[in-house]
Regions:
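Extended active-site neighborhood of metal-dependent phosphoesterases/phosphodiesterases
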Residues: 1-86, 120-126, 132, 140-174
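Short acidic, glycine-rich surface-loop motifs adjacent to enzyme active sites
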Residues: 88-108
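A cross-taxa feature marking solvent-exposed loop/turn segments within ectodomains of secreted
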Residues: 91, 163-164, 188
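Histidine-centered catalytic micro-motifs
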Residues: 98-105, 131-141
Length: 195
């Protein structure tokens, strides 16, 4: 079990949670910061910034029947990001963590050539002083070191839904020390970062 009664669990949706018959009711299951699917908040002296990437296909793709408008959502978040990075709460934080579903940084066969989040937010996030970015989407664990693809911070991408590729990330902060540990389904450590 996750133990959400004792340990904070923060939910951020991915593209699959937007597509199914239950997606419309998903909002009723979670409290959203500022009633938006993206936002920022402090957890102790750590600033958590969560972004909503929307879908991984253009709004005009036939599967959406003209019902999606994630382009405007991403544009709104670009404005939010500029304000957030300039905010007192962000600047005062001892650590800053970025969380979003689709990786903005990273290259190779696992990364989509269509990446509107990188187009919209990449220039804003390139120099941002985050300790780490936590992502998913590719269904394969990856570690992108700081500076490998224009990223100013390490990027950790979680694994997939199958047991042979599944991962769990444990972000922990004690005092001034922050660590991120990535485990596979066997409980083996794939990566441990001192942030």
């Amino acid at each position: 079990t996750v133990g959400a009664d004792r340990v904070p669990v923060f939910y951020i949706r991915g593209n699959h949670e937007i597509r199914n018959a239950y997606s419309i009711g998903l909002r009723s299951l979670f409290d959203y910061v500022g009633d938006k699917t993206y936002g920022a908040f402090n957890w102790g002296d750590t600033r958590i910034v969560m972004l909503d990437c929307g879908e991984d296909k253009p709004d005009t793709h036939w599967v959406y029947y003209g019902l999606n408008d994630f382009s405007d959502l991403r544009k709104a978040q670009a404005g939010f990001l500029k304000e957030e990075l300039a905010s007192r709460a962000f600047k005062k934080a001892s650590k800053r963590v970025l969380i979003h579903h689709v990786p903005i940084f990273g290259k190779g066969e696992d990364y989509d050539s269509y990446n509107p989040c990188r187009d919209e937010w990449g220039a804003i996030l390139e120099k941002a002083p985050f300790a780490v970015s936590i992502n998913a989407h590719t269904h394969r664990f990856a570690y992108i070191p700081e500076g490998a693809d224009g990223n100013n911070y390490p990027v950790v991408v979680g694994g997939g839904y199958r047991m042979d590729g599944a991962t769990v990330m444990i972000l922990q902060k004690k005092g001034k020390e922050m660590t991120l540990r990535v485990l596979n389904a066997k409980g083996e450590t794939l990566k441990e970062l001192n942030l």
